[in-house]
Amino acid sequence: MDGSHSAALQLQQLPPTSSSSAMSEASFSYKENLIGALLAIFGHLVVSIALNLQKYCHIRLAGSKDPRAYFKTKTWWLGLFLMLLGELGVFASYAFAPLSLIVPLSAVSVIASAIIGIIFIKEKWKPKDFLRRYILSFVGCGLAVVGTYLLVTFAPNSREKMTGENVTRHLVSWPFLLYMLVEIILFCLLLYFYKEKNANNIVVILLLVALLGSMTVVTVKAVAGMLVLSIQGNLQLDYPIFYVMFVCMVATAVYQAAFLSQASQMYDSSLIASVGYILSTTIAITAGAIFYLDFIGEDVLHICMFALGCLIAFLGVFLITRNRKKAIPFEPYISMDAMPGMQNMHDKGMTVQPELKASFSYGALENNDNISEIYAPATLPVMQEEHGSRSASGVPYRVLEHTKKE
């Protein structure tokens, strides 16, 4: 009787043990998601601060009489260190959380850049004018924060370790091979229209960037996951797939940066940021869902809420970048022969080059063959000026003597 009673007790205790194991596994998966999300948010925030620090360093040197190069300043090196730290955090986040969660969190860098840009404004605004000018940025930041919260809350849970066997199995699976075939065909078509037909539309260029970026993030997750497992004691560096993924990661990142550079030469950076974020995030999530099977086993409600979070984050980023205005470039070197009324200034002995209280050091005046046929060379004061000198001469050049040729 005692033996049968104890066996019955053991049978009754088995179901709670299995359910508690499932609950602990889900809790551990959620903790890994949270660690990855926090690392990604921290990384994007630090990268945004680093970029603004380096930009501040360049602006400060351009507006002062400091002859030092930017790489000789502590501010620029601090920005470089923070950038490397932030990129390391983003890279490590892929080892803990699903790709579908980490990729949309790049909206954090857009939010941080908008806030930092407002804080570092030097002009004084009345509250009414300030709100009118930056209302879209505030609304966009709010929407992006709400979207980020939904992404973290309803993201798919990571259940699989990035071992060499798992990565190889995903790489040769027929869904991913079919996806790769479609992506290669689409990439070749877009590249043909871009190079041969001069299709310089921003959507074409950023689609090329997004297709390359999807492969970059897929390989980054594999490389980061295998490195973390190796650090934890489960060595994965002896698998050839690790080096295949590493080479693909570097190659796609380099070509992605090249296309982004070409896009920045033709379009405004705010437009590139908004359109590029939407396209890259959408294609990267699709690639992650196919390669790593991120949404397998997830219920419909979680998938719909995750998609809603993506849409809200897209709208927030669009509003933030929509509020930015194009910067008007300033050209320090002026072509004097293109200025109307130049001959009258010579005749009246007026100042040829006005005094400019700025850091830009003007070079010699440009020669004009048409004017030299009428006027003899002007006699200028004996002064020497070198490009990049510590300060520009405060004494304006004046025409001392001229004679007309008969």
UniProtKB/Swiss-Prot annotation:
Glycosylation: residue positions: 166
Sorted UniProt keywords: Glycoprotein, Membrane, Phosphoprotein, Transmembrane, Transmembrane helix
Subcellular location: Membrane
Sequence intervals crossing the membrane: 33-53, 76-96, 101-121, 135-155, 171-191, 202-222, 240-260, 271-291, 300-320
The keyword Ubl conjugation is assigned to this record: no
Residues where Phosphoserine is found: 372
Membrane topology: Multi-pass membrane protein
UniProt-recorded Gene Ontology molecular function terms: magnesium ion transmembrane transporter activity
Source organism superkingdom: Eukaryota
Sequence similarity: Belongs to the NIPA family.
Entry protein name: NIPA-like protein 3
Higher taxonomy: Eukaryota, Metazoa, Chordata, Craniata, Vertebrata
